[in-house]
Each structure stands twice: as C-alpha cells, then as structure tokens.
Amino acid sequence: MVTLSPAYLPSDGGTQAASAAPSVEENWVVQPSLTLLVLLLVPCVLLLFFLNCFLLFHRLPAFSLRKRASRRKVGQYPCVRVGHSGQARLEPPYMLSPGVVLREGRLGSDTISQGFEATLALEEGVCGRQNTPQSRGSCCQGGSIPSDQICCSPRPRCATPLPCCAPRRAWNAPAYVKKRLRPKVWKVREDELGSSCELDTRHNHVPPNTPAADNALGVTPKVKFCHTSSTQRKSHVGMVPFTLGGSELLEDPSVIPREDTAEHLDASSSLPGPGLDSDFGVSAGISLHILSSDSDSGSQSWTSGMEWDYYDPCYMRRNRLRRDARHNRHLPMMCSKQYWI
C-alpha cells in the first residue's frame, strides 16, 4: 500500500514521489503507548500488596496476644506476698494460692466480678498500722496459713481487715461492684407491722390525759405507743432530763408530786377544761379532784410551776397562780391531789 504525501510532490506538479510506509520499530519509538505505563504500574502495585500482607501477618499475632492478655488481666489481680521482714510485695498475677484453679478459657461475667470483688477486698483491707510488726497468721482466720503464703483467692479468705495486704496504688472500683458489695439495709415498711400493735416513734404531742411538758430546751421526748383495742397506753422510751425552770411528764397518772401552790375552794379559780377525756370515753373519763390539807404544802418543790384543773390536765402558769393568790388571800392554803378512776 502506497500513500502519497504532498511534501514529496515537485513544485512544478510533474512526477509523483512514492514514499515507503514507516516500519513498526519507528512507530514503537515515536508514538507513546499505554502498554509502557501499565508495565510500570503493575510491579509497583504488586510490591505494595505484598508489603501490606507482610505487615499484616507480622502484626496479627501481636494483636491477638495483647487482646488475650487484656482479657486475662480483667479476671485476675495482683497477689501480695509477705516476707519475714513484714513488707508486702506484689507477685505475678499467675501465681495463685493452692487449691484455687482458674481456667484461661473462663472469661464470663462471674469470673470478672470475682476478680473485682477480691481486688476491692484487698484495697479495703489496708490498715494504718504498717509500722507495727504483725504475723501473717494474726490477720487471717485460724492462723493456719503460713507467713509466706500468698494472700489472694477469688473469694478472699481474710474476714478481718488485713494490715499486710497493702496495694501500691489506689484503685477505683466500678459502680456495679460497689453496689454489689454495699451492705443491705432491711427497711420494715409500715404496712408489714401488725395493726393490733404498731410501734410508732414520733414527737410527743401532748395527750389529753397528761399535763404538757414545759421543756426549757424545746426538745420533746419521743414516746412509743402501742394501740390495743380502744385504749392507748403510753410508756417512756427514755428518762426526761431534769430542768429547773420546766416540768416533767409523769410516768404513772396516779403518782403526783407535792405542790406548794394554793388551791381555792370556789370553782372560779380554775380554768374551764375541754370536758371529759376523749381517750377514756365519756362514761369512764371521770376525774375526782380531792382537796386535802398537807403540812408540807409550803415546801419549795420543782413542780410548783403548774396546777391541775378539774377535768382536763391543763395547768396554770406560775404567774396566773400568783395573780389569783393576790385576789384571794383570805382562802386557806390547800394541797391538791388528783386520782383517775
């Protein structure tokens, strides 16, 4: 095949010049080809691929060993060995006390929780008396464990605080471990108590059948009540402290101390009460106000600051008694006693 090129034609338009086609070698050298680029990129890609595979397979065993070691450290804890010098030192976590076998494949939640509990027990067992020489058998139960034996197990053997088990750095237990080791406080609900006898500790609001306590300190004693049928029985939990300016609750209503106050014969000197006592009912709540002369009625007693009325146990203050005594000086001095029936 012959191609004609206008460059080889003579200017005068005479003869035609035939030029031969260029060879394959000339086309190979002159024209750039994609084959050369592919041949250069393929070795580079293969080299990078083999290098990546080499690094991956080289680092894979290290990653697996590190992961296995981290799992193993979660279920184990450092052991403490105490020598004859009395100083505690940490041992490798793989050395356990005889009779304790932990399988490496057991990585459940129970093993992890046991490890955390034992580590927390070792942390809490630190005693401040590190300078005092103590034997190993004195801090463990029974004293049968030798002094150079390791003090660690999944369930700690030492029930008392261990002065010899001292960790090197503090460790904060997770929240769920602290919640599990927290002592349980049993709270008795009010509805669990029987309705026939309910123990209720409350502030002493003055019952209708006893005089109110005038406590100088402003603290009312606590009274324990036991409800039986329709009668409410009162008993003091503690003794009421003695106060000079105040008064005292009487333990027994029939026992009434002496008074040096003036009791008047007419009913106008006493304050009207609220009526019969609601605690004893209308039929049984009758109080007798017996007036009797007493030789020692003029004695200065600490109960002279109050006086009982006819029905209700309300009392009159000392200033009220003195004011009534000024108006009624002609009346005789009497001592009052009250009996409940």
Curated annotation (Swiss-Prot):
Locus of motif VPPNSP motif: 206-211
Extracellular-facing ranges: 1-36
Main location: membrane
Keyword Transmembrane on entry: yes
Gene ablation phenotype (knockout): Morpholino knockdown of the protein results in embryos lacking the body axis and dorsal tissues. Reduced dorsal marker expression but enhanced ventral marker expression.
Membrane topology: Single-pass membrane protein
Transmembrane segments: 37-57
Subcellular location: Cell membrane
Cellular component, GO annotation: plasma membrane
Cell membrane is among the record's keywords: yes
Gene Ontology annotations of biological process type: dorsal/ventral pattern formation; embryonic axis specification; positive regulation of canonical Wnt signaling pathway
Cytoplasmic domain ranges by topology: 58-341
Keywords tagged on the record: Cell membrane, Developmental protein, Membrane, Transmembrane, Transmembrane helix
Record's function text: Key maternal determinant of the dorsal organizer and body axis formation in vertebrates that acts by promoting stabilization of beta-catenin (ctnnb1). Localizes on the plasma membrane of the future dorsal blastomeres in early blastulas and binds to and promotes the tankyrase-mediated degradation of axin (axin1 and axin2). Axin degradation results in stabilization and nuclear translocation of beta-catenin (ctnnb1) for activating organizer-specific target gene expression.
Self-association state and partner proteins as the record states: Interacts with axin1; leading to promote the tankyrase-mediated degradation of axin. Interacts with axin2; leading to promote the tankyrase-mediated degradation of axin.
Family from the record: Belongs to the huluwa family.
Protein's recorded name: Protein huluwa
Organism listed in the record: Xenopus laevis (African clawed frog)
Lineage, broadest ranks: Eukaryota, Metazoa, Chordata, Craniata, Vertebrata
UniProt gene name: hwa
